[in-house]
Regions:
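Conserved AMP-binding/adenylate-forming core of the ANL superfamily
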Residues: 8, 16-61, 65-69, 86-91, ...
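Conserved pre-ATP/AMP-binding loop-to-beta segment of ANL
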Residues: 16, 126-127, 146-165, 172, ...
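Structural core segment of the AMP-binding/adenylate-forming
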Residues: 25, 41, 45-46, 73-141, ...
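Conserved AMP-binding A3 loop
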Residues: 28-31, 161-185
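AMP-binding/adenylate-forming catalytic core of the ANL superfamily
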Residues: 41, 85, 102-104, 242, ...
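Conserved AMP-binding/adenylation subdomain of ANL enzymes
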Residues: 184-201, 209-248, 259, 263
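Gly/Ser/Thr-rich phosphate-binding loop
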Residues: 222, 247-252, 261-322, 335
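Conserved ATP/PPi-binding loop(s) of AMP-dependent carboxylate-activating enzymes
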Residues: 329-333, 344-375, 412
Length: 506
C-alpha cells in the first residue's frame, strides 16, 4: 500500500492516456509520472531526505499532482496548505511541521516571506513559474535538469505520507498524520463504491490541498477516466467546462450545489450531461439536494468523512437505495459504531457519538500526544460527531458534540433548525448557533442570507419557524448577512459566528 505507486499502477492497467485536462491542455499519466520522478530527484539533490516535510501551497494545477507524487517518491512527507490561509496560519504550519522546503507560486511569495520569519528549518522556496527570483529555486529547472528515473528508495506502508492540518475552526490547526496505508486504502475503498462508465468525465473543483480533494484525486488513479481540473471553483467557469467537455459529474460541497440552484448563471449553459455528483465536507440539506436534482436532473450521493479518517467513512452506493438526509453506509473495510458517554453501543435509531475503525484511521496528531490520546482510543477514532444508524445500516449525522444547543435543558440540533430555514423561499443560506442566556442557559440565534431582491423581516422568518418547529426550537434572534463565513471547502465557520455575536454584544 504505497501511495507513490498509484500513477504507475494506472499506466500498467490502462496504458498511456490523458488523465488530466487543465486550461485546455491534456496531460497523460506518463507525462505526470516522469515529471514526478524528475522532481523527486531534484528534491534529493537539494538535500531533502526521507521523512523530511515539504509544504505545497498552490492553486489546483497539474503541478500539484506532480509535486505530491514527487515528494512521496523522494521519501518525504507532503504538507498540503490551502493558499487562502493567512501569514499567521502558514507560519504555524511551517514551524510546527519543521518543513525543509515549500513548493509555491510567485503570487504567494510575499506571504511565504512574512510567514517564514524566524523559521530555521525552511531551506528551500521552490517557485513553479519560469522566473529567476533571488532566494528561490526554479521548479521548471528542477524538472529539466533531473532524471525521469524513479529514485531507488524503499517506502513502507506505515511510513507517513501526509500531514494534513485541520482548518483551525476550533483553535490552532492540528497536524493529522496520514500514512501511505491510510490514504491508499481509503482511495481503494472509495473506488469500490464507484461505478463509472467508460465515457464518464469528471470536473475536479475541490482544492487538492484538502483531504476530500486529495482522496478524489487518489481514487481517480483507479480508473481510466479523464478529469478536467479547475484552479478553484468559479460557478460560471464550471458551467462553461461542463458544457464544453460534457462533464458527467463532480464531487462538491453543499455550498456549490446551493449556488447552482439559486444563481441564473447555469441557465445560460447546457448542463444536461450531468448525471451524478457527490457531496461531502459539510451536511447537505434535503432542500438543497432536492432543488439541485429537480433543476439539473442529476442525482447527488452524499457521504461523510474527516481528515483523521483519510477522510472517507461512508457514502451512498450508486446501486443501492438513497435516503435523503443520510450520509450513507460505511465504505468497504471501515467499521463504525454509535456509542454513549460510557462507550456502550446505543440502540438503533438513537443518537450517540460516531466512532470509526479501519486501515484509513490516522495514527494521531503530529507532536500532540495528549490530543492523540483523547481522540484515538483502543483502535477507534472518536469523531466528536453525533449520529444515529437505522435498521439498514444507513448513518444520519446529527451534529458536532460541541455545536449542540441546550435551551432550558432541551437539546437542539442546529441542522434541524437550519433545514426549516432553508424551506423559506427567500432564504438561500442559513446557520444557527447557541448564544448565552441568563435564564435558559442558551438561546438560538439564526444567521440568514436572503436571495437577491428578497425583502423579508426577522418576524416573517420567526413566523415561518414557529409553523414548523416547537417553540423552544424557534430562534430567539435573527440576523441578516450577505454571506456566511465558510472554510475553503464550504464548512460553516460557527466559531466566527460566535465571535461575531460576541462583538455585537460588547
Amino acid at each position: 500500500m504505497n501511495l507513490a505507486e498509484l500513477a504507475e499502477q494506472n499506466i500498467q492497467r490502462f496504458g498511456e492516456q490523458t488523465t488530466i485536462i487543465y486550461n485546455d491542455e491534456e496531460f497523460t499519466n506518463v507525462r505526470l509520472l516522469r515529471n514526478a520522478n524528475r522532481l523527486a530527484n531534484g528534491l534529493i539533490r537539494l538535500g531533502v531526505k526521507p521523512g523530511d516535510r515539504v509544504v505545497v501551497m498552490l492553486m489546483n494545477s497539474p503541478d500539484v499532482i506532480v509535486s505530491y507524487q514527487g515528494i512521496l517518491r523522494a521519501g518525504a512527507i507532503i504538507i498540503p496548505v490551502v493558499f487562502l490561509l493567512g501569514e499567521k496560519e502558514v507560519s504555524h504550519i511551517l514551524k510546527n511541521s519543521e518543513a525543509v522546503a515549500i513548493i509555491t507560486s510567485a503570487a504567494f511569495l510575499q506571504k511565504v516571506k512574512i510567514a517564514d520569519q524566524g523559521i530555521e528549518s525552511l531551506k528551500h522556496v521552490i517557485i513553479v513559474e519560469s522566473q529567476d527570483i533571488p532566494g528561490t529555486v526554479s521548479y521548471p529547472k528542477l524538472l529539466a535538469e533531473n532524471s525521469d528515473e524513479r529514485p531507488a528508495l524503499e517506502i513502507k506502508e506505515n511510513d507517513l505520507a501526509v500531514i494534513l492540518y485541520t482548518s483551525g475552526m476550533t483553535g490552532v490547526p492540528k497536524g493529522v498524520m496520514l500514512t501511505h496505508k491510510n490514504l491508499y486504502s481509503n482511495a481503494v475503498s472509495t473506488a469500490k463504491t464507484e461505478t463509472p462508465e467508460p465515457d464518464d468525465i469528471s470536473l475536479h473543483v475541490l482544492p487538492l490541498s484538502h483531504s476530500y480533494g486529495l482522496t478524489v484525486m487518489n481514487a481517480g488513479w483507479m480508473f481510466p477516466n479523464k478529469a478536467v481540473l479547475m484552479p478553484w471553483f468559479d460557478l460560471e467557469e464550471a458551467c462553461k467546462l461542463i458544457e464544453k467537455y460534457k462533464i458527467t459529474g463532480f464531487a462538491g460541497v453543499p455550498a456549490m450545489f446551493a449556488m447552482m440552484i439559486h444563481s441564473d448563471i447555469p441557465d445560460h449553459y447546457d448542463l444536461s450531461s450531468l448525471s451524478r455528483c457527490g457531496s461531502g465536507s459539510a451536511p447537505l440539506s434535503v432542500e438543497v439536494m432536492r432543488g439541485f436534482e429537480e433543476k439539473f436532473h442529476c442525482i447527488i450521493l452524499e457521504g461523510y468523512g474527516l481528515s483523521e479518517a483519510s477522510p472517507v467513512v461512508s457514502t451512498h452506493y450508486p446501486d443501492r437505495v438513497r435516503k435523503p438526509g443520510s450520509i450513507g453506509q460505511p465504505i468497504p473495510d471501515v467499521e463504525v459504531r454509535i456509542v454513549d458517554e460510557n462507550d456502550r453501543d446505543v440502540p438503533l435509531g438513537e443518537m450517540g457519538e460516531l466512532i470509526v475503525r479501519g486501515p484509513n484511521v490516522s495514527p494521531g496528531y503530529y507532536n500532540l500526544p495528549g490530543e492523540t490520546a483523547k481522540t484515538f482510543r483502543d483502535g477507534w477514532l472518536y469523531t466528536g460527531d453525533m449520529a444515529r444508524m437505522d435498521e439498514d445500516g444507513y448513518l444520519f449525522l446529527v451534529e458536532r458534540k460541541k455545536d449542540l444547543i441546550i435551551v432550558g435543558g432541551f437539546n437542539i440540533v442546529p441542522r434541524d433548525v437550519e433545514e426549516v430555514l432553508h424551506l423559506h423561499p427567500a432564504i438561500i443560506d442559513a446557520a444557527v448557533i447557541g448564544v448565552p442566556d441568563p435564564i435558559m442557559g442558551e438561546e438560538i440565534k439564526a444567521y440568514v442570507v436572503l436571495a437577491e431582491g428578497e425583502k423579508v423581516t426577522a418576524e416573517d422568518i420567526s413566523r415561518h419557524c414557529r409553523e414548523h418547529l416547537a417553540t423552544y426550537k424557534t430562534p430567539k434572534y435573527i440576523e441578516f448577512l450577505t454571506a456566511l463565513p465558510r472554510s475553503p471547502v464550504g464548512k460553516i465557520m460557527r466559531k466566527e459566528l460566535r465571535e461575531l455575536h460576541a462583538k455585537v454584544k460588547e
